[in-house]
Regions:
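Hydrophobic beta-strand positions in blades of beta-propellers and related beta-sheet-rich domains
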Residues: 37, 50-52, 83, 98-102, ...
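A short beta-strand motif characteristic of beta-propeller blades
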Residues: 14-21, 62-73, 110-118, 163-168, ...
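Serine-hydrolase catalytic core recognition
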Residues: 232, 236, 322-438
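A flexible loop/linker signature enriched in serine peptidases of the S9 family
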Residues: 41-51, 71-77, 92-100, 116-124, ...
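N-terminal targeting or regulatory segments adjacent to alpha/beta-hydrolase or S9 domains
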Residues: 2-7, 278-362
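Beta-strand-rich domains and repeat architectures in extracellular enzymes and scaffolds
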Residues: 5-55, 72-82
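Conserved beta-propeller blade repeats
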Residues: 23-35, 70-90, 119-135, 170-186, ...
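Short loop/turn segments that connect beta-strands within beta-propeller blades
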Residues: 56-59, 104-108, 157-160, 208-211, ...
Length: 438
């Protein structure tokens, strides 16, 4: 191909402002339940409504959330964990009133939490259903008229026949109430202001009594200097969790009061918990633990075999992954790559075969115009090392003069933990295809 010689920054590109403005859905979260897979979509063309979608075993997809409902919670303001699933029954928080609703199949959702005197004063998130299907355990956030905000864990009947009862309180923040498969134990995370969950959290465990009250609770892990992420119970009722006690978020488990690391490595199995419902590991029927871990800014997929202290990687072209779940044998997740936007994926953990189920948007851009990231690092103040992705100018139609360097756009993240991900950004490609480095 004959390339035109033109200055960096002056190249013509097929990626236009109109390309960037194309409205596409966004996948918020995903979870397997029974023989179905559910995910939540944010739909800009429906006014930013959050819609729960169900994929049946035969591959058909159905919108679960009816028009007029919006499956979104405002607990901790950032939300997440807006839905819980029990076979064909869905429980979700509704954005307009922040109440909890129960929806059986295609029936109209029924409100199961009381109406507060002040609108939006009671909010619910991150719920789980007891194994017998009779009770729900949720994080509840109450906003008082004087501005005081109270977080607590509550239990309520699945049919909403009585009001929620508080079973854990006293800390400023709660998350991740998780019920053991045998229904006998409850684990949860909590922390106090001014700590953030990536600074220090506490993991607590208590017996879950037959009347849904809690027995004597004990702190299992965590504290002001230890961040705990995603506590989960294995099918054998063994508590697992991610901890940064080694300065890396690694996976641990507790057996008979002893805590042991499963696969120590210089990688992050956790991430900052801005929202509820994050999932970066799950349990397969084979006894393996499937996991997502981050190294050098890229996400990788792997499995930990029973009795082994290492992770076996699963080859995967997707480098940004979230919401890892399983139907028992296959892995389900939301994945993206430098050349492809978010996609619902089904992955065979044995041979790594990937099936694309649903793309967030169909992007009609020739891959030759796509710049892929190079992980770089450089020294910064206080003898620290900064990390970044570099996207080089990329356009098959142009080349720059040999003695010229490209203009560089430097995009810094906002907030204390925000970071770029290794996934397609048309905004980045808009500039790189015109001869800018980013």
């Amino acid at each position: 191909m004959n390339q035109k010689i033109a200055a960096y920054g002056s190249w013509q590109s097929p990626i236009t402002a109109a390309t960037l403005a194309q409205a596409g859905r966004r996948f918020v979260s995903l979870q397997c339940s029974g023989d179905a897979v559910y995910w939540v979509e944010l739909r800009p063309l429906e006014g930013g409504r959050y819609v729960i979608v169900r994929r049946a075993p035969d591959g058909t997809t159905t919108d679960v959330t009816p028009k007029g409902y919006n499956a979104r919670t405002l607990v901790h303001e950032y939300g997440g964990g807006m839905a819980a699933f029990d076979e064909g029954t869905v429980y979700f928080s509704n954005f307009t009133d922040q109440a909890l609703y129960r929806q059986d199949g295609a029936e109209t959702p029924a409100r199961i939490t009381p109406t507060p005197l002040t609108p939006l004063a009671q909010r619910y998130a991150d719920g789980r259903i007891t194994p017998d299907g009779k009770s729900l355990v949720y994080v509840r956030e109450i906003h008082l008229d004087d501005g005081t905000v109270i977080n607590e864990i509550v239990v309520l009947p699945a049919d909403g026949s009585s009001e929620p009862a508080v079973i854990a309180s006293g800390y400023d923040f709660y998350s991740n109430p998780r019920i053991s498969p045998d229904g006998k134990w409850l684990a949860w995370l909590c922390w106090n202001h001014p700590m953030m969950p990536w600074d220090g959290t506490e993991l607590w465990v208590a017996p879950l009594e037959t009347d849904s009250s809690l027995g004597s609770a004990r702190r299992t892990a965590g504290g002001p200097q230890e961040s705990i992420f995603q506590p989960e119970w294995s099918p054998e009722n063994i508590l697992h969790f991610v901890s940064d006690r080694s300065n890396w978020w690694n996976l641990y488990r507790e057996i008979e009061g002893e805590i042991e690391v499963l696969a120590p490595m210089a990688a992050e199995f956790g991430e900052p918990q801005w929202v509820f419902g994050k999932s970066r590991y799950t349990f397969l029927r084979s006894g393996h633990i499937a996991c997502i871990y981050k190294q050098g800014g890229f996400d990788y997929l792997g499995v930990i075999e029973p009795g082994k202290a290492s992770v076996t990687s699963i080859p995967c072209a997707f480098t940004s992954m979230s919401s890892l779940s399983t139907d028992g044998t296959a892995l389900w997740l939301i994945g993206a790559s430098p050349t492809q936007g978010p996609t619902v994926l089904r992955i065979n953990p044995t041979d790594g075969r990937i099936q694309e189920i649903q793309r967030a948007a169909e992007i009609d851009v020739n891959p030759l115009y796509i710049s892929t990231p190079e992980a770089i690092e450089f020294p910064t103040e206080h003898d620290k090392t900064a990390h970044a992705f570099y996207y080089a100018p990329t356009n098959p139609d142009y080349a720059a003069p040999d003695d010229e360097l490209p203009p560089l756009l430097v995009i810094t993240h906002g907030g204390p933990t925000s970071a770029t991900g290794a996934q397609l950004s048309l905004t980045t490609q808009y500039w790189t295809s015109r001869g800018f480095g980013v």
